[in-house]
Amino acid sequence: MIIKILDPSKNATYLWLPVYFYDEPFQFQILSSIIELVFYISCFHLMTISLYVMLKVQIFHRNLYILYIPMFCVWYGLIAGKLITIAYRLKFVDLDYELGEHIAMWTDDQAKMLHVSSLRGLELLIFGGFVQWHYMYTVVYGILGVAAERAIASVLIENYETNTQLYIPIALTIITQFLAISTSLSVLFHKASVFLSHLPWIISCSLGALAYLFIKIVNENFQKQITNPRRKRLFTISQQFQVKENLRALRLGTRLVFVVFFYVAFVSFGMFALAFDLVSSAYCHFVENFLFLNPYPICFTAMLTIPHWRKHFQNACFTWRLVKSAWTKPKTSTTSVEISTTKKLEAETDLYFRQLNESWI
């Protein structure tokens, strides 16, 4: 959505928001908003349980937690921005004009822009658009920050595991957040072109792939040396643990990268198709919500990849317990019958041997 602000001196200012408004009957908008809220509440539960399990069962280095936990937490801000958009769709926020239909991610067509003389009444919508941009670029730069931290852990294997200094994750967090906020503001105020807005994705994916290969090669080489009985280098327990942690994080990262790449590809294709009217605007609901509902594949991938997390996640997740209880009811009944039969046989056996013993007396 592009907003064009034309002041009295005829100077135009543009704002670029990643929000969508549809030309649909009001009753249908209410229904679609209710359905979206149901899915968001489910995602809220899933994300909260995942964060709880990650913090309760800490199997990675503290620095890694400091980096990637905020990446999960900013999803709550993303949903807050979406709720603001829903409030404008359902006209909970009164405006003196109609917002109209805006389903293009970006456009230079003046007819498809929202023309206003001031931003009065749009402050919340602009804030909601900013937090959505911030989430996208936080994930982009955050993944690069995690890759950098694992690369540093591979280089400083001699003492990284025993290092209690927090300057590495704090410095990486400050850098990634500075880049995320500055890029979000640049895109929001339309200071960056369409190509420049996509450039961080390209750079991050390229550098992330190089960091992935570097971490993989270095740590697999260390693992071969550790398992080699004729090795010349002595590895301490903490160093061996660090190598295993790097490889475990790499395995988890590989699965998450594939999930994220699929999401980026699907959403990008959807935005392209909608921008050039290749598909009906009705599909915009699905493309848009693919971003907001990302905890489903990402959290499930993270939780079910690591056995320690999987066990606690299954015990804590309300939905998982419901499904499990539904499937285990018949088994529970059968098990109870088997236990009862076993106890009866044991009692009869004890009675037989007691009577046999008494007959010998």
From Swiss-Prot:
Subcellular location: Membrane
GO biological process: sensory perception of chemical stimulus
Parts of the chain that traverse the membrane: 34-54, 66-86, 124-144, 168-188, 195-215, 256-276, 286-306
Xref: InterPro entries: 7TM_GPCR_serpentine_rcpt_Sre
Record key words, sorted: Membrane, Transmembrane, Transmembrane helix
Topology relative to the membrane: Multi-pass membrane protein
GO cellular component: membrane
Main location: membrane
Homology family: Belongs to the nematode receptor-like protein sre family.
PANTHER family reported in the protein's UniProt record: SERPENTINE RECEPTOR, CLASS E (EPSILON)-RELATED (PTHR23128:SF60)
Protein name: Serpentine receptor class epsilon-32
Natural source organism: Caenorhabditis elegans
